[in-house]
Amino acid sequence: MSASVVLQPGQVTLAQWRALYRGAEVTLDPACAQAVLRSAQTVEAIVARGEPVYGVNTGFGKLASVRIERDDLQTLQRNIVLSHAAGVGDPTPVPVVRLMMALKLTSLAQGASGIQPDTLALLEAMLRQGITPVVPCQGSVGASGDLAPLSHLAAVMIGVGEAFVGDQRLPAADALARAQLQPRVLGAKEGLALLNGTQFSTACALAGLFEIETVLQAALVTGALSVEAAKGSDTPFDARIHALRGQPGQIATAAALRALMAESAIRESHRLGDVRVQDPYCLRCQPQVMGAALDVMRQAARTLEIEANGVSDNPLVFSDTGEALSGGNFHAEPVAFAADMLALAVCEIGSISERRTAMLVDPALSGLPAFLTPRPGLNSGFMIPQVTAAALVSENKQCAYPASVDSIPTSANQEDHVSMAAHGARRLLAMADNAAHVIGIELLAAVQGCDFHAPLRSSAALEAARALLRAQVPTLQDDRYFHPDMLAASALVRSGALATAVGIVLPGVELSA
């Protein structure tokens, strides 16, 4: 675990969410306690007045017109958790669930949900002590909130379901008891407050954003290495070209490519007398493609940062006036749109990378030995790794179909338009993983291509990247079992080690990055 992140409700930065996803501990700013208490007292006053308020003393969804007696309000809240814990599929990764828990924590702590202070304290304690609910990954349509996934979170808080504690999967009651925590008996509105909201979709989208950001930065490094391997030109990265268009992502990625290739002996060796006029688009248009991806990612990041700091419960409690107002903040359309944009971005990052690998293995395009092997024919070299990259890119293209354009009415047509944000966001981790493999294959191919130019060396930044790979994967002479090489390369991409090794601050999703 890294240093603790202090969550200030409504003011959590993207960098803090990233740190939390990467393993930072969580502390809730105690300054929120008064707002939480006032909100809970407002709900208690509403119950005492007996006025009908959705989810407080009524049924849910299509059953909203059914009034619930005061003596049954605790049972109502327990029942909604139990009945809505209807997810299926593999468990959501622990880092994503922890992110979801923190998102729910900061949402509830804003004092608009009517949660009891002790319930909020239990959620914070579970995060702090590493009790992570087992949350099946399928079952949310992204409106009315992420009901099924969040119900599996809430179930653990009442002692039902399962939780991960370290590497153990335990019954919820045992997990709480091990940490000397007591399950809660939920009061009026508390069950609904816990399971209504966009926190699952937002957590998945943020996790995808952070992984795709790492992939993009690695792809800038491998893209520069591919230019070197093919003895391509750095002229297309000239700042004057990109300033005339004005697209900020394009300007930033072109600057990164210039910095990565600065003072390369390989580039200088063919600056004069090269008969080629223009490189293929996969080399020449990297700033245009990668810059567009970066701009889209930054737009998605802004949407997700706002969502992560908002309140997506329903109804919302306004303590100043003593009201509980029904609305639709649970509808995750902003998250769905952001997830769709991220899917397009990671798809294109991988697509142009695969084209560079295909270019490198083709001697007619790269001027390098066929399939990057010294003895083609006897050896197949990088023939099939390029095929694997093509397969993964094709898979990502199929996954990139927008989820937000789909909608299936639910709850007897009461919830007649839904966002499908959960599905749209959940696919991002798999797409990022596919792209990491594609970039890893390009890393292997580009470094192999640069090896053919010895004793010429690349820039200091790219030589550091080459050394990082070569510390684990030797130059390919004759064919060998390729699988471990590919896993090693993709791990360097996924971990961020490749982007860090070059010693250059590469553009990221924060506008200041």
Swiss-Prot record:
Contains an active site 4-methylidene-imidazol-5-one (MIO), which is formed autocatalytically by cyclization and dehydration of residues Ala-Ser-Gly. The modification 2,3-didehydroalanine (Ser) is found at S144. Its EC number is 4.3.1.3. GO terms for molecular function: histidine ammonia-lyase activity. InterPro entries: Aromatic_Lyase (IPR001106), Fumarase/histidase_N (IPR024083), HutH (IPR005921), L-Aspartase-like (IPR008948), Phe/His_NH3-lyase_AS (IPR022313). Pathway: Amino-acid degradation; L-histidine degradation into L-glutamate; N-formimidoyl-L-glutamate from L-histidine: step 1/3. There is a cross-link at A143-G145 (5-imidazolinone (Ala-Gly)). It catalyses: L-histidine = trans-urocanate + NH4(+). Keywords: Cytoplasm, Histidine metabolism, Lyase. It is found in: Cytoplasm. One of its GO terms (biological process) is L-histidine catabolic process to glutamate and formate. It comes from the Bacteria. One of its GO terms (cellular component) is cytoplasm. Belongs to the PAL/histidase family. This is Histidine ammonia-lyase. It comes from Xanthomonas campestris pv. campestris (strain ATCC 33913 / DSM 3586 / NCPPB 528 / LMG 568 / P 25). The gene is hutH.
